[in-house]
């Protein structure tokens, strides 16, 4: 990353992330969502009771009518997101990575992928990063499962700059 990129991440929307201070991937997502919400009136954020860990507070404060917590019900999260996408909304569905892939795999495959619906699924805490929560919260096979779905694109950004660019797209 160049020095200019290291200090500031600036997208076409004037989205700025200060990279001189350590910015986590989750914080980058939260900041980007708050900015993108002003550009896309049909953007909705749905969570499976991971509002705080997903850092969506800024979006939730700016657009409380476009943020929904379905509770610890990942299967429901995916089916609701599919229904909203079918009606013209652009849902972003947040859950812990192992639950965004394994717990609701049938709903993702059947409701979202078969219908080619534009649902963005964001699984946070991939790999061993949620290890303190126990082995059930470690996602080691999530990417392998999701790439097996037809009409699914799996992206794994490596840093906050890549996250911002992916969300802008």
What do the predicted segments below correspond to?
Residues 2-169:
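Thiamine diphosphate
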């Amino acid at each position: 990353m160049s020095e200019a990129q290291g200090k500031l991440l600036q997208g076409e929307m004037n989205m700025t992330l200060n990279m001189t201070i350590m910015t986590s991937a989750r914080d980058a997502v939260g900041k980007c969502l708050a900015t993108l919400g002003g550009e896309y009136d049909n953007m909705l954020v749905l969570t499976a009771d991971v509002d705080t860990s997903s850092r969506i507070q800024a979006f939730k404060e700016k657009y409380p009518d476009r943020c929904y917590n379905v509770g610890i019900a990942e299967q429901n999260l995916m089916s609701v997101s599919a229904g909203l996408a079918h009606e013209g909304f652009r849902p972003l569905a947040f859950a812990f990575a192992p639950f965004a892939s394994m717990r609701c795999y049938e709903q993702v495959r059947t409701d979202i992928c078969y219908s080619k619906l534009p649902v963005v699924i964001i699984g946070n805490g991939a790999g061993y990063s949620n290890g303190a929560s126990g082995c059930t919260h470690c996602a080691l096979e999530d990417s392998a499962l999701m790439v097996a779905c037809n009409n699914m694109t799996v992206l794994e950004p490596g840093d906050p700059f890549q996250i911002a660019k992916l969300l802008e797209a």
